[in-house]
């Protein structure tokens, strides 16, 4: 291994899972582990085998299935933990035992009730026992960020002497700042005589929002392994996010000269979405690299710049992480250049329309809707102002019966005619969707469905967003209500009306 390769140690399945309200199932963990392997992660920390029988079985199954990544299990500096970790890992092609003990004065005195000499002795014994099972042993000085530096240096020196091949320096509570954390790593390299015999790793938490910054600062001082999680999942405020540190290394090669990872960056986005779906942890829209707004532009000035040269406002190409769709949002802040480009993409020559007229109508629509989609813009070309938001379909009544066979009854107004249908489904939302499809005689495919709370309390409003695909085109719908079924119905009908308007546009184009 070259000195400038940064080893990516992913702990989504161990530290990341600790942040979840409930444990993941064995097959869910395996699905994530296989995705991490496909992403190119070097080391996957699969769990803490001694913590539960379920975790033991999950680590064991992952160890038997993953072949290209080293599988790691966590253990305290206790014989039973280390033995259990080995039993879970021994079927793996490549495995690592990761043992740890707290080294800060606060943790030693108040949590462990031991002095430094006792902690040092426990650490050495644990490493020696782990080495009896494998040469690949990692040792962590828990709460290293608040450990007296002389104690930390002495602990690291003795851990390496005992046989640890990787020494992890965690900022367990996210207390240190980048320059401070960098200095800790620098001092270790200057004062620990056998530091060259081990790989120095860092594990940074995000309590002060600097986990990625701390990790990058450590690389510059000699750290060669970064412990991180997908989407920054982890205890409290989370961990260093894999996608952030990897893309920082890739993007800032001018500053982080020579450093690289083996991560297949084009798989980052789909791995992020998979972990989000399995853990039921939504990704904040403003999350760096993988948030829905990370590559979105709504300001007219920004959009104009991106249309001329993407690098004016994008330091990373969306395709670099596996995003291949346009994230230019049409809102009331969009300028004429954006509208003109969108119309060109829809196939309209600028000589066939009056841009000022279309833009004026666009602004009126954007003020009403917030976000305008390409099919809305196309409707402006063919429908009168009064019909731009014409709703062919309106829900008049809605009732749902839950139970063994969820059933919905929907009454809709189509022009002046009322139509009623009752349908079943796997759940009440699907039953409503089936009713609307039958009444409208349109059969789009549901591609995305999401719920977000718009307020708190028992009377909280929920917003439902749906994406329907019809004839190869996606249509968005939104609904808001204190009743999630009603909000879902509103969202479906909103999307169906968009489909209706697009069909009407096609008729006008053919006329």
UniProtKB/Swiss-Prot annotation:
Top-level taxon of origin: Bacteria
Record field: catalytic activity: 3-methyl-2-oxobutanoate + acetyl-CoA + H2O = (2S)-2-isopropylmalate + CoA + H(+)
Biochemical pathway: Amino-acid biosynthesis; L-leucine biosynthesis; L-leucine from 3-methyl-2-oxobutanoate: step 1/4
Record's keyword annotation contains Metal-binding: yes
Any one GO molecular function term: acetyl-CoA C-acetyltransferase activity
SUPFAM superfamilies (UniProt xref): 2-isopropylmalate synthase LeuA, allosteric (dimerisation) domain, Aldolase
InterPro entries: 2-IPM_HCS-like (IPR050073), 2-isopropylmalate_synth_dimer (IPR013709), AIPM/Hcit_synth_CS (IPR002034), Aldolase_TIM (IPR013785), LeuA/HCS_post-cat (IPR054691), LeuA_allosteric_dom_sf (IPR036230), LeuA_bact_synth (IPR005671), PYR_CT (IPR000891)
Domain Pyruvate carboxyltransferase, chain residue ranges per copy: 6-269
Cofactor: Mn(2+)
Subcellular compartments: Cytoplasm
EC numbers on record: 2.3.3.13
Transmembrane among keywords: no
Binding site for Mn(2+): 15, 203, 205, 239
Region (Regulatory domain): 394-511
Pfam families xrefs: HCS_D2 (PF22617), HMGL-like (PF00682), LeuA_dimer (PF08502)
GO cellular component: cytosol
Keywords linked to the UniProt accession: Amino-acid biosynthesis, Branched-chain amino acid biosynthesis, Cytoplasm, Leucine biosynthesis, Manganese, Metal-binding, Transferase
Gene Ontology biological process terms, A to Z: L-leucine biosynthetic process
Protein family according to the UniProt entry: Belongs to the alpha-IPM synthase/homocitrate synthase family. LeuA type 1 subfamily.
Subunit structure: Homodimer.
Function field: Catalyzes the condensation of the acetyl group of acetyl-CoA with 3-methyl-2-oxobutanoate (2-ketoisovalerate) to form 3-carboxy-3-hydroxy-4-methylpentanoate (2-isopropylmalate).
Protein name (database record): 2-isopropylmalate synthase
Species of origin: Campylobacter jejuni subsp. jejuni serotype O:23/36 (strain 81-176)
Lineage of the organism: Bacteria, Pseudomonadati, Campylobacterota, Epsilonproteobacteria, Campylobacterales
């Amino acid at each position: 291994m070259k000195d400038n390769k940064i080893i990516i140690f992913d702990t989504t399945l161990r530290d990341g899972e600790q942040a979840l309200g409930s444990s993941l199932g064995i097959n869910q963990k395996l699905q994530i582990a296989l995705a991490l392997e496909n992403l190119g992660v070097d080391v996957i920390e699969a769990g803490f085998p001694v913590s539960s029988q379920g975790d033991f079985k999950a680590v064991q199954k992952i160890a038997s299935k993953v072949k290209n990544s080293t599988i790691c299990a966590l253990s305290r500096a206790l014989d039973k933990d280390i033995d259990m970790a080995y039993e879970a890992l021994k079927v793996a092609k490549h495995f690592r035992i990761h043992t740890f003990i707290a080294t800060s004065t606060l943790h030693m005195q108040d949590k462990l009730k031991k002095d430094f000499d006792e902690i040092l002795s426990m650490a050495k014994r644990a490493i020696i026992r782990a080495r009896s099972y494998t040469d690949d042993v990692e040792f962590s000085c828990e709460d290293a960020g608040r450990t007296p530096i002389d104690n930390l240096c002495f602990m690291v020196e003795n851990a390496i002497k005992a046989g640890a091949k990787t020494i992890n320096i965690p900022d367990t509570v996210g207390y240190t700042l980048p320059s401070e954390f960098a200095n800790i790593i620098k001092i270790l390299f200057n004062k620990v005589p056998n530091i060259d015999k081990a790989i120095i790793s860092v594990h940074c938490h995000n309590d002060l929002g600097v986990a990625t910054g701390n990790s990058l600062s450590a690389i510059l001082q000699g750290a060669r392994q970064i412990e991180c999680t997908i989407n920054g999942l982890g205890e409290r405020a989370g961990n260093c996010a894999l996608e952030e540190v990897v893309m920082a290394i890739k993007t800032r090669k001018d500053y982080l000269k020579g450093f690289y990872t083996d991560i297949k960056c084009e798989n980052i986005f789909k791995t992020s979405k998979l972990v989000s779906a399995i853990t039921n942890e939504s990704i904040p829209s403003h999350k760096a690299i993988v948030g829905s707004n990370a590559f979105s532009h709504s300001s007219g000035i920004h959009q104009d710049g991106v249309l001329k040269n993407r690098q004016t406002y994008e330091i990373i190409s969306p395709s670099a992480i596996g995003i291949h769709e346009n994230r230019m949002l049409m809102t009331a802040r969009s300028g004429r250049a954006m509208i003109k480009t969108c119309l060109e993409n829809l196939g309209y020559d600028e000589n066939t329309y009056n841009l000022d007229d279309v833009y004026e109508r666009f602004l009126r629509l954007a003020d009403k809707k917030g976000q305008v989609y390409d099919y809305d813009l196309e409707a402006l070309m063919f429908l009168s102002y009064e019909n731009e938001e014409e709703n062919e379909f309106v829900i008049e009544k809605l009732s749902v019966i839950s139970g063994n066979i969820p059933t919905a009854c929907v009454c809709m107004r189509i022009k002046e005619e009322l139509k009623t249908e009752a349908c079943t489904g796997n759940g009440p939302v699907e039953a409503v969707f089936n009713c609307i499809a039958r009444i409208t005689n349109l059969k789009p495919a549901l591609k995305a469905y999401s719920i977000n709370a718009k307020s708190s309390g028992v009377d909280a409003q929920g917003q439902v967003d749906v994406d329907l695909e019809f004839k190869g085109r996606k249509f968005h719908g939104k609904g808001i209500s204190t009743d999630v079924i009603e909000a879902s119905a509103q969202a479906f009908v909103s999307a169906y009306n968009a489909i209706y308007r697009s069909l009407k546009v096609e008729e006008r184009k053919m006329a």
